[in-house]
Amino acid sequence: MILHAQAKHGKPGLPWLVFLHGFSGDCHEWQEVGEVFADYSRLYVDLPGHGGSAAISVDGFDDVTGLLCKTLVSYNIPDFWLVGYSLGGRVAMMAACQGLAGLCGVVVEGGHPGLQNAEQRTERQRSDRQWAQRFRTEPLTAVFADWYQQPVFASLNDEQRRELVALRSNNNGATLAAMLEATSLAVQPDLRANLSARTFAFYYLCGERDSKFRALAAELAAECYVIPRAGHNAHRENPAGVIASLAQILRF
């Protein structure tokens, strides 16, 4: 079994760019940014429970990493960068820290490196279980209307929230809930030490208005690019800013 993905081929000899979306996104999420880098071959992945991979369920990050590795092999991708947003960034960091043959580097936008104590994990598990129950049982428009009121999305205006609620409500609530629980921050290890000891290139992007993740970025041994006029979802709020940062990273 492999993950559903869209592949776009570029020039031979360059590494692939493998894009991983955030929670409730899909393979289209990164394409406005990724298609600027047409010299590189691009793979836009649907994570389990999402898009064309909605029917795929996992028990945790190890399963996600295994599926990602099989997917890369199936597309004959010898060397690559992982570019991930939020959940996709956490998947990228987890997979990279476990060791991936052919990995050139990781670019994470607004991805959490992991909680650092049992109290935080217990609280996060309680919160994610409540959200998962809502995703399973309530209309998605109602759930996402509340989801985008969370503090991390404080920089969004009303119009941006309405657009995101409409876009995300096309998902399957049950499969979103399953993925939310399987990849909760409550079950993700703290990756700070692994990332400090890494052997791969590691860059971090965060929105200028995303105070929570700017603070987290300062804790990581990574070169950080702050995206102007953007909050947590920087590549949606300021794609040109993310494109400029990615171009610098890739020396495009």
Curated annotation (Swiss-Prot):
Q: What reaction gets catalysed by this protein?
A: 5-enolpyruvoyl-6-hydroxy-2-succinyl-cyclohex-3-ene-1-carboxylate = (1R,6R)-6-hydroxy-2-succinyl-cyclohexa-2,4-diene-1-carboxylate + pyruvate
Point out the coiled-coil segments of this chain.
none
- Assembly with partners or alone: Monomer.
Organism of derivation? Escherichia coli O7:K1 (strain IAI39 / ExPEC)
* Gene3D superfamilies xref list: alpha/beta hydrolase
Q: Check the record and name the HAMAP family matching this protein.
A: MenH
For this UniProt record, give its keywords in alphabetical order, as a comma-separated list.
Lyase, Menaquinone biosynthesis
State whether keyword Plastid applies: no
Any keyword Lyase? yes
- Role of this protein: Catalyzes a proton abstraction reaction that results in 2,5-elimination of pyruvate from 2-succinyl-5-enolpyruvyl-6-hydroxy-3-cyclohexene-1-carboxylate (SEPHCHC) and the formation of 2-succinyl-6-hydroxy-2,4-cyclohexadiene-1-carboxylate (SHCHC).
In the record, biological process GO terms are: menaquinone biosynthetic process
Cross-referenced InterPro entries, in alphabetical order? AB_hydrolase_1 (IPR000073), AB_hydrolase_fold (IPR029058), SHCHC_synthase_MenH (IPR022485)
Which EC number(s) are documented for this chain? 4.2.99.20
Protein name per the record: 2-succinyl-6-hydroxy-2,4-cyclohexadiene-1-carboxylate synthase
- Gene symbol here is menH
Q: What class of enzyme is it?
A: lyase
